[in-house]
């Protein structure tokens, strides 16, 4: 049984010091979405043998006062804070059976800002796709759209539709209907990562390989080729589509050899898929333990994820999505030794 401790609300300016969360941070708001994120985060903390920090954030709303004074009225801070503390206590109770160290905090401030600041020291941020509404409920929803693009650490968005695979239930009739429509999907022990030839995608592949090793899973590297491939800058037009697929597969095979040099015991598969990046990713999420992408790229998976199609990936995925921020990795230096690089001129 891990140690459990309720922390006082620290001053925001002290968040960057040594007391800031160092392990996995999960945002909760009392909603079913937040509960799913919490369960996923607790399991991940157990896999990594890292502490879990549970956080909820609230802000005190200000309303225009009625009457002739033209003033403003505020809601009692203590009332809202008590509700937030109850949410935290419920979350602490829910993960009490995991063999992890857990602490928690209630933060007074904008949820996006709180979590973004925590990303400076956290290993991983985890949250649901939307919240329950209300003041504390603002933690999720818009946060799940904003954070992946700006967080300093990797983020995982956990959609409510995968509650059944986490052993959770929901009263959301829309989600239950969607789960019934999808049917029981057997989850494969596989981590899927989308690549598009960018260096950022290769960084995402390395993070995906780390995740696959932790899960004891196969890593599946996928490149999507849309029908109108002229939208992909490095694809010539007109083209021999069959030849294009063969060239991309050869490049993926070279990338596989590179990965195996760094992860000799990892099972790695590679595949070229016909279709749009969003469609391919959503389809893969139905069966994968996790799908992984970078924050930006050439216009395929990563380039589209946090641009105009973010709703099509993060909001329609059927499983958890890990987004990897841009960063340097010394293992990228030897990639060229293993053959042609996807997307290279």
Feature locations, PLM:
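Structural beta-alpha unit
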Residues: 2-20, 33, 93-125, 164-167, ...
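Glycine-rich, Arg-bearing micro-motifs that act as flexible, cationic patches
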Residues: 127-150, 164-168, 290-316, 330
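Short, flexible helix-coil linker/hinge segments at the edges of structured domains or between repeats
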Residues: 164-188
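Small/aliphatic-rich secondary-structure junction motif
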Residues: 2-73, 182-238, 267, 344-345
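Short beta-strand elements of ligand-binding domains
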Residues: 128-129, 155-160, 322-325
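General small-molecule cofactor/ligand-binding pocket signal
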Residues: 53-55, 103-107, 156, 220-222, ...
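A short acidic, glycine-rich active-site loop
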Residues: 72-86, 239-250
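Conserved N-terminal glycine/acidic-rich loop preference
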Residues: 202, 213, 221, 231, ...
């Amino acid at each position: 049984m891990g140690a459990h401790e309720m922390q006082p609300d620290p001053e925001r300016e002290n968040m960057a010091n040594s007391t800031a969360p160092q392990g996995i941070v999960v945002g909760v708001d009392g909603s079913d979405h937040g509960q799913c994120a919490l369960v996923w985060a607790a399991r991940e903390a157990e896999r990594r043998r890292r502490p879990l920090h549970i956080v909820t954030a609230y802000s005190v709303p200000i309303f225009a006062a009625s009457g002739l004074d033209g003033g403003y009225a505020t809601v009692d801070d203590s009332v809202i804070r008590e509700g937030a503390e109850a949410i935290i206590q419920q979350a602490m109770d829910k993960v009490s059976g995991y063999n992890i160290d857990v602490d928690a905090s209630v933060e007074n401030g904008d949820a996006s800002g709180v979590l973004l600041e925590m990303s400076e020291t956290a290993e991983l941020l985890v949250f649901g796709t939307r919240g329950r509404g209300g003041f504390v409920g603002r933690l999720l929803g818009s946060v799940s759209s904003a954070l992946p693009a700006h967080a300093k650490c990797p983020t995982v968005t956990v959609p409510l539709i995968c509650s059944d695979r986490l052993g959770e239930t929901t009263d959301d009739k829309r989600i239950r209907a969607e789960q019934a429509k999808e049917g029981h999907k057997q989850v494969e022990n596989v981590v899927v990562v989308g690549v598009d030839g960018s260096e950022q995608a290769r960084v995402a592949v390395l993070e995906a390989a780390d995740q696959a090793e932790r899960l004891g899973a196969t890593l599946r590297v996928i490149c999507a080729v849309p029908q109108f491939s002229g939208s992909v800058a490095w694809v010539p037009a007109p083209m021999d589509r069959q030849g294009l697929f063969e060239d991309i597969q050869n490049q993926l095979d070279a990338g596989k050899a590179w990965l195996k040099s760094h992860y000799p015991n990892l099972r790695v598969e590679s595949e070229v898929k016909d279709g749009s990046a969003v469609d391919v990713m959503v389809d893969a999420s139905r069966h994968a333990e996790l799908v992984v992408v970078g924050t930006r790229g050439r216009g395929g998976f990563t380039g589209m994820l946090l641009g105009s199609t973010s709703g099509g990936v993060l909001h329609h995925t059927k499983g958890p999505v890990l987004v990897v921020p841009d960063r340097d990795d010394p293992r990228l230096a030897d990639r060229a030794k293993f053959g042609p690089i996807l997307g290279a001129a």
